[in-house]
Structure formats: structure tokens, C-alpha cells
């Protein structure tokens, strides 16, 4: 990751991250990062760089990207729809980053389904493989709709079904919203990286009240 450290030192990463809040900065971003990529793709790329510093530079960032990189390690095309934008595997944890420049209203239409699907499928995949790794998704955007924030929290309270194998379910899916400015601050907290992720999981712990997956069917049978 010497390329990242040389072209994108910490302060440059912060500077670039701050530019996304104003779309008049699009040309600056393309000029510095990649003229061949969309600004949305560049956002995924820069979010990864910020996370690299938050993680204390210990992750293999370039292999964690699901976006397409050029021979010069410049972003070209954003991640495809079947997988998360950035998936970081470590011995004890898997962190998935889902980054979007959609505004708070558009996120409901464009992000709720794929982010949830990717998060559920990744967690179930890890459970099937018996890895025992902690799985966390961070949903990163410049702004959030309050319903988006609360929907992600509520998801942890109910069993979720795999879209790959309908026989498989998982619980306590963790999707934590973090905005761009908050991520920028976190880049200076690499010594707290593991603790912060553990704290996120504690925040999402819910009481398991034996959620009944057949609640709707049972009710409908009574009224129809």
C-alpha cells in the first residue's frame, strides 16, 4: 500500500473527503484522483483511503476494493451490484463499507435493499464457513435520512433471510451509519479502531424475544 501512503497521505485523504459535500468540487476530485471515474466511484475510493488510516494502515486496502482499478491503481468503475463496495477481511473480523453519494431521500430507493442484502449474505456466509469472525457493515454517506438511521438499527432486532439460499437466516445484522465528516475524525483514532467496532456491536445488541417469523401468516389466518 505504498502507493496510498505516497499519493494519499492522511491529510490529503481528509481534504478530498471534505470536497464531496459540494458538487461544484467534482472537477477537482476528478483531476486529482481519476479523470476516467465517476465522482461516485471516486467517493468509494476515498472512503477506503480514510478507512485505511482509521484502521491504523494495517489492512490490505487495494485487495479489499470491489471497484475496478487501473494499472496505476486509479479507480475506474464502481463495485458491481452483487457485493459490497469494500470488504475488509481480518483474522477476527470482517468489515464491509457501503459508500454512497445519494442524498438522504434517494438512499431509501437506491440503497436500502442492496446494503441490507449484502450485509445479510456476508454474515450468513461467514457463519456457514464457521469463521467465528465478527461481521460489521458501515453505511457511509454525506448525509442521512433519519428513517434510514433507524431502519438500520431496527434490522438488528429481527431474523434476516439469505437471498442466496432461502433456508439460511441470521440475526443481529449490524449496519452502522457514519457520515463523511465523522469518518474524517475517525482517521485520527486508529488506536481505538478495535474498541470502536466492538462498541458498535454493543450498541446494536438487542434482546432476543424469540421473534416469530410466521407472525404475519398467523394473523392473516385469523382474519381471512
Tell me the role of every PLM-derived stretch.
Residues 2-224:
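Catalytic core segments in nucleotide and nucleic-acid processing enzymes
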